[in-house]
């Protein structure tokens, strides 16, 4: 509902250009890799993302319809996986890149025997507790286990580069 209101108010208030941020989850679950833009709406969405994806698709289509019907200049952009300042690096809840960065950082500290820094970084009480915790995520002083099959292709974009791209598109 919020995006509908924003898009409609942009039209009513003669906004010169509107940038709508979509999401890569709008593409089908079994889209080919690398993913071409034109595969939108060609197959089933990932079930766990479906409500969010449908809402994003509705926003994209609403912008497209306003452009056709009213001559607006509403553009849609689908950013890829973003990372950067203020990201979530929690090993239990973060996305793939922040988790990988944190795992490598902790493994490096372990390898360099900087145990106080590891304990502090993880907000735990002892190095034994920290090592046991990190082991759950495949991290020790000699290796970092990277989860998954290695088959999915992923793209990452630094958040400040995305911000620059948005400004560029609006100019």
Task: Outline where the language-model segments fall.
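Conserved Rossmann-fold NAD(P)-dependent oxidoreductase catalytic core, especially the SDR/UDP-sugar
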Residues: 4-50, 75, 88
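Hydrophobic positions on the long internal alpha-helix
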Residues: 2-10, 62-63, 165, 169
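A structural signal for well-ordered alpha-helical scaffolds and beta->alpha junctions
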Residues: 3, 56, 93-97
């Amino acid at each position: 509902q919020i995006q509908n209101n924003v898009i409609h108010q942009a039209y009513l208030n003669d906004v010169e250009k509107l940038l709508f941020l979509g999401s890569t989850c709008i593409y089908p679950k079994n889209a080919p890799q690398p993913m071409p833009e034109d595969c939108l709406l060609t197959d089933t969405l990932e079930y766990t993302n479906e409500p969010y994806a449908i809402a994003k698709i509705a926003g994209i289509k609403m912008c497209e319809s306003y452009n056709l019907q009213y001559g607006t200049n509403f553009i849609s952009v689908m950013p890829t996986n973003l990372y950067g300042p203020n990201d979530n690096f929690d090993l239990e809840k973060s996305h793939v890149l922040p988790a990988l960065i944190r795992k490598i950082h902790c493994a490096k500290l372990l390898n360099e025997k900087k145990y106080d820094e590891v304990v502090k970084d993880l907000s735990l009480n002892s190095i034994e507790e920290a090592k046991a915790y990190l082991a759950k995520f495949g991290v020790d002083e000699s290796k970092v286990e990277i989860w998954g099959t290695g088959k999915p292709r992923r793209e990452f974009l630094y958040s400040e580069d995305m911000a620059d791209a948005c400004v560029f598109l609006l100019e």
